[in-house]
């Protein structure tokens, strides 16, 4: 029993480390290795639900690299592990959201949106099963953030704006990392709508938050939005963003991490 408790604690710690490596630092290879170690510890603990969470996180690695088959295989494994344990609606919806993000990154926007609608239905249904204590990274608001990004990448600009503005209004001020991501996506929405000044205002808000809380995934979204502003790169608003995006501190943070 003591061995299982220790193994469970180790698996949770390694999962957190893998999340930091993948999302905060954008070190996918290191994260992939850490997720394997986390899965080994979850196996020692015989914790199927923790194993499902680790496998789903590991699906981000091939999914974000555009390798759909690898992501699907890992998601199938994650869902198989989840079926072996009592599972809450929150966890089931999150599994849908993870797979949807992988599909989005691989260009299957229709499939991703279908999964996100299913996740919303799952969350809306009653469930007596509570999520485990370590499951702290997902909520209805986070699901909306997933959907807004998919709508953006699918070219559904009005829908993406509505979804992301709602998400931003619901996010607590303390959730700085997610706010950076949503602000970056909203800036991309405004750039796609040919509203460069509004996009720049959102990017400046994102850069304000990045100065407080560095988040490599958030910086990626900021850079994506800035690339979308290339047609207006000689305007004063875009140059102000560039002056901040390529300040000494921001440039050094990007290179060091």
Placement of each model-derived feature along the sequence:
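Conserved binding/catalytic microenvironments
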Residues: 1-257
